[in-house]
Each structure stands twice: as structure tokens, then as C-alpha cells.
């Protein structure tokens, strides 16, 4: 079998990175593309696939935001006309092997774009724990917590269904049970690696259909601005987002008709019930869920704050406004059950940096709400 290998994929792949891979594909003319690696390799592989099959495709058109992936203004090019795409993950977290998403960074602007279209769904995914056995502890931890955030956000999404709920809950049960084992003895514990591989893929199937939320919007930009691993960025922000979304009287709700009243606290409480975390009221159950997530992070060596990762305070504050605006504009924000104001995103970033908890501030004025809504409509 004639083959060639492109192995220069960066941890946060850039558009230039994908273009280089597409050039190699154009020279070789493959009829099968195999993306073997973690989320970066699979995401970059998807973009290479697009540029190989459709070199005329415009990146900014593909990155255009939309309200519903099935009813978008831009028609994504039809994939599979030249090559069959196979994804083989070597880490348990991203779920990219079963999702219609690819995250890529514009190297010129530094903006990280989550591209989304069902044409990006791989033709085949091969889940084999043998490829995971040598993953180092840091990667195992970051990837595992990333999968937690996928399952939690999919369950809280305004587009969640019975199908995505089952996948998300079962993924979480297995992650809480097997991630510490995979972290501590991953080179020898085949069962833990296999269960984590399956859990990450199930979480991927959940958010492939229910989508994500503002935790990922913020994590995309935190990672792009300060070069934190994606899973770590999600881990640092997830508690803040759970508290933010749990408000019974949000400043602004999500935008889909099926989400007709605030009930995200009850949804998080259902996760706590499934994991048998205890609690008599929804408030207690949410606190127990947050506690369990924090204990899991401690077990796998995730630090508590953004500051703990050596991010300079002045640099963080200097870039906070730009990071906040880009997070607000991120594609993932639209499926969040509570539509955030930019001031609220900024506060969550600050809390995650200093290790504080999100609390409701004074209700914004009508003028502030109108300004945020106007900006949201303009960007959409």
C-alpha cells in the first residue's frame, strides 16, 4: 500500500499547519486519510481533508457563526469525493473522532475558531485502547477532564435530547470511576484505558448532537491567548460555568424555544443523582457535583486556578477584555442555557484566575441588556 505521513501537527494547530498538510495531500493524492493522534491531530486532519478536496474553500466562510448547524447561511463543501477519512484517537478526551467539529487557530490573528458542520464527521472511528496505553499523566488528566466538560455541557445544553442525555451520563459515570486509575497506572491498567476511551467517545457523541456551551467558548480563548492545554482550560472554568448556569433568575436565557424556562440547576442535580452524590435539594446536589469534579481534578493533578499555571497577572488583565469579547462571539455560546453578558464572562475569567466563586451581581440595566443583545444580533 502506497502511503506517506504528515507529522508536523502543532499542539494548537494553525490554519497554516493545515494548509501545509493539504499541500502534501495534493501532491500524493490519497484516497484514504488516517488521522492518528489526539484532538489536535484529528482536528488538523479534518481541515487538511477539506482543503485537499476543496482548495477553493474560504476559511472565514467556513468559520461563519450560525444559530442552527442544520440551517446555516453558508453551505459547507461536500466531503468524501476524493478521500475516505478515518480517525483513530490516542487520547481519551476530545471526542473529535465522532464529532462534526474541528478547532483551528488563525496564526495571523491568534483567534481560535471552532468550525462546525456534519460534513466534518469522520467516515470511520477506530477506538482501540492499545493506542492509549503510553499516554503521559498530564495528557491523561487534561484529556479526561475535557471529556467531563463535554458530557456536562451537552447535558446542560438547550439542545439536549434523551439520546444525548444517556450518552453524557454514562460517560460521566465511567470517567469518575476510571480516570484516576488511568492517571495513576495507565501504562498497565488496560481496563481503565478502555473505559476512558469509550467514555470520551460517548461524550463526543453527546456533544456532537447537543453541542457545548460557554465553558468551551471561554476555554477556546483562554487557550489561544495564554497557551494552556484545552482540557486544562476547561477544567479551570467548569465550576464557574456551573454556578453561572444554575441561576434560577438569569439576566438572559438561551435562545431556543424548547428551553422555555430556567431549569439548568435541576439538570445539574440530575447528573448528581446519576452519580449518586447525595443531597436533598437541587442546590445541595449542584454543590456536591462541583465538589466531586474538584476532587477528581485534585486526584489527577489539575491545579486550582489560572494563576497557578504561571499566567502573569498583568498580562492576563491587559488581555482580558479582548479575550472576553472573543469568548462572547464564540460559536459554542449559542447553545448555553444562560446567554452571558460580556461583563459576566469577564467576571468568570477573573474568578477562575484568582480562585473565587461566581455570585450574582446587581441586575444589569435595560441599556446594558440592549447593548449586549444588539452586539449579539450583529455578530450572529
What does each model-found stretch correspond to?
Residues 315-380:
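Short, amphipathic C-terminal "tail helix"
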Residues 16-23, 27-130:
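Glycine/threonine-rich beta-strand-loop-alpha-helix active-site module
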Residues 98-210:
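Carboxylate- and glycine-rich phosphate/diphosphate-binding segment that chelates Mg2+/Mn2+
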Residues 93, 201-234, 329-335:
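Glycine-rich phosphate/pyrophosphate-binding beta-alpha loops
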